[in-house]
A protein has these predicted regions:
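N-terminal nucleic-acid-engaging modules of covalent nucleotidyltransferase systems
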Residues: 1-211
Length: 211
């Protein structure tokens, strides 16, 4: 069984779409669960870790097991590991892992960017492992649909800003901001704070979509 970081290196090294698809199918047929578990952690927009900065490894440690990493990821998802404790624990993981393990695998999962030119679409189409799809409604240029532009309609200016989808989860007592591509946004603390103050007034979980 190929190590997950070795598979990722192979995907990153080849720009061919067909080659990437073949690699994904090969690993799926080989039942490389560790690889696809990590891929799903990184590509699933609904799984967030609350991590802003993840260090790069500069020297080899003894090696980090997937089980230990998975345990920490679970704590990050449940927000039972936060703040300075989170930072210190991630630093410990970085020091424990080899450079190859950390920089080419574990770190990329935590920053939710595999950097290998592969999306959830490739995984879902060419493997038995599936990644939940984070999707939002997007506008289409009316110039491509002129025949539909008849009758009365409402027109508004096109906003030029940052698309933000806010998920207010009353069960988890948590507010999370996402980009249109499902990447967690951590650079709008004031917006997050405003929605967090509204959370106690909500009787059910809600989603807000805006620019």
């Amino acid at each position: 069984m190929m190590k997950p970081w070795t598979v990722l290196q192979e995907l990153e090294a080849d720009n061919s779409r067909l080659k990437k698809e073949a690699i994904i199918k090969r690993e799926s047929d080989a039942d490389n669960k560790d690889f696809f578990d990590g891929v799903c952690m990184a590509l699933d927009g609904f799984r967030t870790f609350g991590v802003q900065k993840v260090p790069t490894s500069t020297k080899d440690g003894a090696g980090l097991s997937q089980d230990i990493f998975d345990l920490v990821v679970r704590q990050l998802e449940e927000r039972t590991l936060t703040g300075n404790d989170m930072r210190d624990r991630i630093d410990e993981l970085c020091a424990t892992a080899t450079k190859e393990e950390w920089n080419d695998w574990y770190r990329r999962i935590l920053i939710k960017d595999l950097r290998c030119g592969m999306t959830h679409k490739t995984v879902n189409k060419f493997s038995k492992y599936k990644v939940p799809v984070f999707d939002c409604m997007l506008a289409t240029d009316s110039a491509k649909h002129e025949k539909k532009m008849v009758g009365e309609m409402i027109v508004e200016p096109k906003l030029d800003g940052v698309r933000v989808i806010v998920i207010c989860d009353v069960d988890k007592d948590e507010v999370t901001l996402f980009s249109r591509n499902g990447k967690e946004l951590l650079n709008f603390p004031e917006i997050n704070k405003q929605f967090d103050e509204m959370l106690d007034q909500m009787s059910e979980s809600m989603v807000f979509d805006g620019e």
